[in-house]
Amino acid sequence: MLGGFPEPKTFGYRAYKFLSKNNYDIIIDNQSISHGMLKIQKNNPFIEIIHHPITFDFKFELAATEKIKHKISRYRWYSFLKMQKKVAPKIKNIITPSHSSKKGIIDEFNCFENAITVINNGLDADEFSPIESITPNPFRLITTASADVPLKGLDYSLKALKLLKKEFPKIHLVVIGKMKEGGHTERLIERLNISDSVFFKSNLSKNDIKELYASSSVAIVSSLYEGFGYPVIEAMSC
């Protein structure tokens, strides 16, 4: 894949054209960090939501890529970061879900600290709570990988599983997420010869996830970076 990803830039222009036709009490953008948002900011109360700087995704993907052709494709795909680095410092009001993300935004995007407000994400403790009727499987590990990308760190969990199987043959890993067919993770699982010990679960309801946590003995969070790690508090709540 050698294409780019122009959507953040083009979305900004489309949003400005559409939103300029009406008056709004407030306009909130989620992570496009585009030139169009600066135009919107001039005429409207405006907030930019930045979950975390996508520069982290780029760095980890680049480090995990070996072939020159694939490295070039990563530079092209993440070319929108140049725009975001220019736009972000000019945004007056930014909301982010954690102090870790706030630090990342300051360091990576050179934003002013007083322009950033931290509002933690919440979790419904009634939806994610212990299920006393389910006995945890002593050999079941569980992790979440919302995307088949290096940032999620699934490689480390899989390699650790390979080592653990030598001492605990029954041990297995449940992954909440969908494996990309023919992708890096599938190839790694085959290379490690652990296909019979890794189970991917996707399209789950919140109750399904709750039951999987309840049936597991250890929850693994192997992400290399998270702006706000939902799997951590979900696992702790269950």
Describe the residue ranges of each PLM region.
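Membrane-proximal helix-turn-helix segments that form the acceptor-binding/catalytic region
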Residues: K17, K71-I94
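Active-site proximal beta-strand in glycosyltransferases
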Residues: I26-I28, Q41-H70
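Carbohydrate-associated surface elements
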Residues: S100, G122
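Nucleotide-activated donor-binding/catalytic signature segment of Leloir-type glycosyltransferases, i.e.
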Residues: T185-N207
